[in-house]
Amino acid sequence: VNAESGFEIKPVYRPGDVSPDASIGEPGEFPYTRGVYPTMYTKRPWTMRQYAGFGTAAESNARYHQLLAAGTMGLSVAFDLPTQMGYDSDEPIAHGEVGKVGVAIDSIDDMRRLFHEIPLDKVSTSMTINAPGSVLLLLYQLVAEEQGVPGTALQGTIQNDILKEYIARGTYIFPPKPSLRLVADTFAYCRKEIPKWNTISISGYHMAEAGASPAQEIAFTLANGMEYVRAALAAGLAVDDFAPRLSFFFVARTTLLEEIAKFRAARRMWARVMRDEFGAQDPKSLMLRFHTQTAGVQLTAQQPEVNLVRVAIQALGAVAGGTQSLHTNAYDEAIALPTEKSARLALRTQQVLAFESGLTGTVDPFAGSYAIEALTDEVEKEATALIERVFSYGSAVDAIEQGFQKQEIETSAYRIANEIDSGERVVVGVNRFAAETEERYEPLRVDPAIEAAQVARLAALRADRDSVAVETALADLAKAAGGNENVLPLMKEALRLRATVGEVCHTLRGVWGVYHPVERF
């Protein structure tokens, strides 16, 4: 049997299969193979952070209140595609996409509605937003200030990982160089203004969903992480001033053993890179802390209830692998946005693992398993070789511009598709054990009238604000973007005056330009 990462999985593992110098160590100690904290889940479970957002800010706010009442421990905001791409809801390119795959946020007014009656000093919030990540973070900070909550009390994460957008996802705006400058500006701003905030979630999840193997997922993610560290150092930041706030985001597939090994390998690889290559001294700079989401790409529209089983196995792998927070997908997400019932069942899956399985009673319970330790070594070996190939191009950005990571992922995705089509890779309910008839399922649908209502609110905002003050603030932002000063303070002032997400992003487009990928065959 071959692992997803390409190496052979043996039918039996013995003591001789484990490297005698395997860096297993102790939990909470370098190189953190067994976990970043000594006690891990024995004192408190991982953060159960369910990703949600659709339609209007008011509708998403209602869903957040439902999730908090059901026991979720942190919020995770999904934004619609126009917001992710830095467009306002009334722009022609946004037509038909407003509120579809996440919530539409155009201005501080929408952000205020999104977190209505949610005390921002009492909840940790993750925002899946990249190219305009700094814009949404500043809107969040402004709403917190209206609540009387200082930036020093805010806790959460913005994804803010633009490099993986060039590789796998595509919601980029600006070219790599100014994008990395914006990331570094965010690091510097948050160090002073929002010190408990995780300023980036360096993401392998999207690459995995595009077809990357476990080894490719962690290799390309860690290579991107190294690029961000270099950008911050080049901007004059000291490594231990920002590295403790770096975080990561990985997938959890149903291939349980390899996934556990992947998480363990990633932790020790990052610890060594930060210590040996970047000279980090603070132990927190060496710790790879990560969020996990179960693999949406493995969910099926056929017999969707079977996805409950898939998600439970995936979640088990994430927890056994030492994740800091977890989102479990709803069983109906291969069809549409989750319903209230399916979202509740997804959360209950985590709660059963945390409170009924006994898994939280022992740190890294798979440690010492011949199979797990050997697989951890193998995944690390494969991923290390891939990182070397990335940097043979000069940098991660150079490799991206040559299409290396994208081509590697596409080759892997093609192999997986062929294996499913041929039946070599079994997908229960799809190419084996299919049902003769499928039960009718009624998915959650987003009301098309939402777009018209959002556009009307945006028109009212433009009519009500001080347009001269907004234009002046945007001009100041453009001047800063063309120079060397940190753009976030000026961006915040424009947003406070009710400039829109689209207006801020268009201002930066005018200075930095937009990215046009080079197609390679």
Residue ranges, per PLM feature:
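Active-site capping/gating regions of soluble enzymes
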Residues: 203, 219-228, 235, 244-429
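A short glycine/serine-rich beta->alpha loop
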Residues: 123-129, 211-212, 255, 297-303, ...
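Catalytic alpha/beta active-site cores
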Residues: 1-253, 258-259, 277, 284-291, ...
